[in-house]
Swiss-Prot record:
Protein name from the UniProt record: Peptide methionine sulfoxide reductase MsrB
Methyltransferase in keyword set: no
Annotated positions binding Zn(2+): C47, C50, C96, C99
Catalytic activity, EC: 1.8.4.12
Classification via InterPro entries: Met_Sox_Rdtase_MsrB, Met_Sox_Rdtase_MsrB_dom, Mss4-like_sf
Xref: NCBIfam families: peptide-methionine (R)-S-oxide reductase MsrB
Domain MsrB: 8-130
Active site (catalytic residues): C119 (nucleophile)
A Pfam family it matches: SelR
Organism annotation: Alkalilimnicola ehrlichii (strain ATCC BAA-1101 / DSM 17681 / MLHE-1)
Record keywords: Metal-binding, Oxidoreductase, Zinc
Entries under SUPFAM superfamilies matching the protein: Mss4-like
Alphabetized PROSITE patterns for the sequence: MSRB (PS51790)
GO CC aspect terms: cytoplasm
Lineage: Bacteria, Pseudomonadati, Pseudomonadota, Gammaproteobacteria, Chromatiales
Length: 131
């Protein structure tokens, strides 16, 4: 996957204030507030910054966490997982492998077959509906 690099000014011009705060500054949207939290429509969720395909609606489930949750990405190569020691805890941060956007976190408490819960901010995603 070809990496996307832009200046801070280019990201600010492309993204809304909330998208910029979450994707480029590592923020988090309020739980239960995102456009895709309750979404059941079929399609592929892409990175809002670079349009990389990240998650399929077929892997989406209701975790009750307040954020869209997925049990697997479209491809492990489309994500980067980094250790996050912020807020006094250790978590695994999920970033877009193409543009380095902060997407959310992954936890080892998801459903089978992976046992993972990718907890992703809605503002980081753009659903390309199928059908």
């Amino acid at each position: 996957m070809v990496e996307v690099e832009k200046s801070d000014a280019e990201w600010r011009a492309q993204l809304t204030d909330e998208q910029y705060a979450v994707c480029r500054q590592g923020g988090t949207e309020q739980p239960f507030s995102g456009a895709y939290y309750h979404c059941k429509e079929p399609g592929t969720y892409h990175c809002v910054c670079c349009d990389a395909p990240l998650f399929s609606s077929r892997a989406k489930y209701d975790s009750g966490s307040g954020w869209p949750s997925f049990w697997a990405p479209i491809s492990d190569d489309h994500l980067r997982i980094l250790e996050d020691r912020s807020l006094g805890m250790v978590r695994e941060e999920v970033r877009c492998a193409r543009c380095d956007a902060h997407l959310g976190h992954v936890f080892p408490d998801g459903p089978m077959p992976t046992g993972l819960r990718y907890c992703i901010n809605s503002v980081c995603l753009d659903l390309k509906r199928s059908g």
